Regions:
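Beta-rich strand-turn-strand
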Residues: 100-103
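Short, well-ordered loop/turn sites that connect or cap secondary structure elements
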Residues: 109-110, 129
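Short, hydrophobic/aromatic-rich beta-strand segments within well-structured domains
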Residues: 105-107, 194
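Ferredoxin-like alpha/beta domains used as RNA- or RNAP-binding modules
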Residues: 1-97, 124-198
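The C-terminal cap of the DNA-recognition helix in HTH/winged-HTH DNA-binding domains
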Residues: 96, 111-112
Length: 198
């Protein structure tokens, strides 16, 4: 799998997001555009919003465009639907549960088969959950020191209202579909829709 190896703090600063959004408990004290960059064009703004979402969720261009295509066919606003598609990825759900420190880590634990959806093992990070799905950890993994340490590190992470989580039991239930109002970062997804619509 291709990985963007640019320094995370540098990317966060460029995209104007807090490192905590991607699970890094560090802050960059230099504000984005602190070096006095020239005014960004409309295309530049659209491209930056796309880069922001791809970076946050660790999704490459081809699957990202596929999510856009799905979003345009769903009811409602395509931009909001795009957020829904990304937030309901299994690797993101594991991250939101606090069962992984970063989304990159969550992709790894999903790939290694540590989690079940409705009692069935799912090892595909891009698997999309739906309302009513119950995500649990395998019994064999539940007693792992690794996951107990992860929960200690992510203890202060807020679990979104669309997930009904029980950290003691390592479980979560999807009680609603997430939307743009549920994310912990600022984004203008309509700019991405405009970019792809050209």
């Amino acid at each position: 799998m291709a990985v963007n190896r640019d320094p995370i703090l540098k990317r966060c600063r460029y995209l104007g997001i807090s490192p905590t959004v991607v699970g890094i408990n560090k802050e960059s004290f230099r504000k984005p555009n602190a070096n006095g960059r020239k005014k960004v064009s409309e295309y530049g703004l659209q491209l930056k919003e796309k880069q922001k979402l791809k970076f946050i969720y660790g999704v490459l261009e081809k699957p990202f465009y596929h999510y856009y295509e799905i979003a345009t066919k769903m009811e409602g606003q395509a931009g909001n639907n795009l957020i829904t598609c990304l937030e309901t990825r299994l690797d993101n759900v594991i991250f939101r549960m606090g069962m992984a420190q970063t989304r990159r880590d969550s992709r790894q634990v999903v790939t290694h088969g540590h989690f079940l959806v409705n009692g069935h093992r799912v090892d595909i990070p891009s698997y999309r959950v739906k309302v009513g799905d119950v995500i649990t950890i395998r019994d064999k993994s539940k007693n792992s020191v690794k996951f107990k340490e992860i929960l200690d590190k992510t203890n202060g992470r807020l679990i979104p209202k669309w997930l009904e989580a029980n950290k003691e039991e390592y479980t979560a239930k999807v009680v609603a579909l997430p939307g743009i109002e549920d994310v912990d970062y600022e984004v203008a997804p309509h700019l991405i829709v405009e970019l792809y619509s050209k």
